[in-house]
Amino acid sequence: MNPNVACLVIQFLLLGAGQASPWTSPPVKSDHPFLFMWNAPTELCESRFGLPLDLSHFHLVSSTLKSATDQSISIFYNDRFGIVPYVDEDTGEFVDEGLPQLVDLKEHRELAEDDIEFYIPVDQPGLAVLDLEEWRPQWVRNWGGKDIYRQISVERVKARNGSLSDDEAEDRAKILFERAAQRYFLRSLRIGKRLRPKRLWGYYLYPDCYNYDYNQDMDEFTGECPDIEKERNDDLLWLWGASTALYPSIYLEVALRDSAQARRFVRHRMVEAVRVSTLANGSYSVPVYAYIRPVYKDSTDEYMSEMDLVSTIGEAAALGAAGVVSWGDMNVTDSEDSCFDARRHLVDVMNPYILNVSTASRLCSEALCQSRGRCVRKRWDDDVFLHLDPRRYRIERRRGPLTVSGGGPSRDDVDWFDRHFDCMCYDESPCRSVETFNAVQDDPFHAGSRSSGRRPSVGSYFLLMAAATSLLGALLG
């Protein structure tokens, strides 16, 4: 064995004896520590306009159409899951009585069971996402347009007991609302987990940390989640303990495009999601799947830049997320032009980056975690990412699909992974081992000299993709 490799092995023996990070569940798709998932009705691009999209680099592909069943990602909107009480924002109509306090949970269970059996006819691994955005289970978080649920709840209490003061009526209404909301949220999860236990059940947008203050002062924006919001997330311990996956959103608005603030925004949201994932059991992390969009949140046709893919996907992968779900609505498919734009974005921008992160995540998992865990950034605020080293690897397109050239991990790759990443193992037993480190490449190219271990800056990952498309070549050169 080369002396340098021997020293590296000894180092890993010393560092890998314990397991500092919590463990988590294995990935939905084996051998893919970080999953890329597509959830949009883009099959319409081919059926309407003859423009198929290249989704071959996504590990799971599904549709959001109401008619689509047996999808690997099943998202349940308010018209697809039992009884969902809410007040229609446009008409003011009370749908299903409007309030969680008024839901017949027996009827809700029966209807939800029918919906689950329709949309998930066979129990197989995948995601099951409950999308209830009309109201929130915590009284204090129903602000703005959602204040209507507090108003109506108070009015109902006063109607039953006119002798109560305003404060007394509100206190009583708060208790009744939160008790019913918690019961509704938990019962819905319980129904899903009982009928389709192989699915990962959770609520879209949970957890959130409401770090939107860049709208007030972009220059001073730190991205930090307000302490009060973290405390409120602590109060949702009952929800985190019942969820088998967490589905936070890291959508970016156009105002954050290509900015350091975008990365801060996402980083703190992901750190909070990971923190919340261990609240119910400090030694176990509930899998986190972050929702992204191919376009900016407040746009229908402006696609995410390469830099913002790093700020969203790159951050999520480095901080220990199990994957990202790229969600799109009908705007992606409503015209031939929109389908063409989506196809061009995938080919020129997104697919090369997906291949980059997928490959680097797998190599790191193999090198550090024996493929029995995913790599997680040691220091959450470091600008290090699960990217291929552009000095060794190339992503190329030569008369066919994108491919990665460069071989397996070198000693420098493994050393760099070890310096910056730990393992989050897929069970309670330690997954870091010295065995795989003997298998790193010991070829003449790397044997003579060791680099400093420093990689080019974050932005230089684009160099790796320069050969993939002429567009990227133009952008970078």
Task: Please tell me what each predicted stretch does.
Residues 25-26, 30-44, 71, 76-79, ...:
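Substrate-binding cleft of secreted/luminal carbohydrate-active enzymes
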